[in-house]
Amino acid sequence: MSGEKDRADTGLYCVFGNPVSHSRSPEIHHAFAAQHSDPVQYEKREAPLDDFAGAVQAFREAGGLGANVTVPFKEQAFALCDAITERADQAGAVNTLWWDGDQLHGDNTDGAGLVKDIRNNQGWTIRKKRVLILGAGGAVRGVLGPILAQEPTLLRIANRTKEKAEALAGNVMKGEGPPVLGGGLDNLMGQFDLVINAISAGLHGEMPALPDGLLAEGAVAYDMVYGSEPTPFMRWAEQQGAAATADGLGMLVEQAAEAFEIWRGWRPNTAPVMASLR
């Protein structure tokens, strides 16, 4: 890891995405760095859709030490790495890059960030709860391992195309772990204690139709999407009687803190940063 040894000089980092103009990552990482007067420069870089590898190489040549990766490049980042962590391997996607000599390393901090936000910031438990995840894209694949490590009673993945949800459930199902079930949104049944939305359409005001009665008494709802006001999914959950709802801003900050610690060798305090972003 790059860690403390880089701290004498300004460390150059970035977030790769396309589009990336909306990203709040520079704001977050500069706020982290300010906590210890750690000299960090963090910028947004829009990588061409057809040349992510070239963008990474150009950043390295410009003196870059590490990077975050957002949509749609996480799978490409995974393929580019010389070495990856176990949780990145599990996710099949990388959101955090750093160089050690000439070796490009990759990690996936999304699931750890989600679990930290749910447990530490929201004060919700996952252990022995019935968990429903809406969606089966890359965002879901990145968080399944850390959620299952919390030992829920069961985990159901529901997606518009049920085959994708079934395939994802089959990939992570382990004999000794909690049951992981996959299926379509149209035949979704049962009651759940924690519902997590990872359908990206939720950003633009379009939630798929969901049946009534999915939320058990005392259930909580978490949207991996975040915005300046409650998301359509959060509003749906409130109408369905959720005891509490949260958006994904805390996950964004917590996964960023995990990445920052890999790069700089110390862990920032996330609470004041979350408060300032609101």
Curated annotation (Swiss-Prot):
InterPro entries given in the database record: Aminoacid_DH-like_N_sf, NAD(P)-bd_dom_sf, SDH_C, Shikimate_DH, Shikimate_DH-bd_N, Shikimate_DH_fam, Shikm_DH/Glu-tRNA_Rdtase
**One Gene Ontology cellular component annotation?**
cytosol
Q: Does the keyword Ligase apply?
A: no
Q: Which residues form the active site?
A: 74 (proton acceptor)
What does the sequence similarity comment in the record state about its family? Belongs to the shikimate dehydrogenase family.
Reactions it catalyzes = shikimate + NADP(+) = 3-dehydroshikimate + NADPH + H(+)
**Protein's UniProt name:** Shikimate dehydrogenase (NADP(+))
Top-level taxon of the source organism: Bacteria
Q: Which GO terms describe its biological process?
A: amino acid biosynthetic process; aromatic amino acid family biosynthetic process; chorismate biosynthetic process; shikimate metabolic process
Q: What class of enzyme is it?
A: oxidoreductase
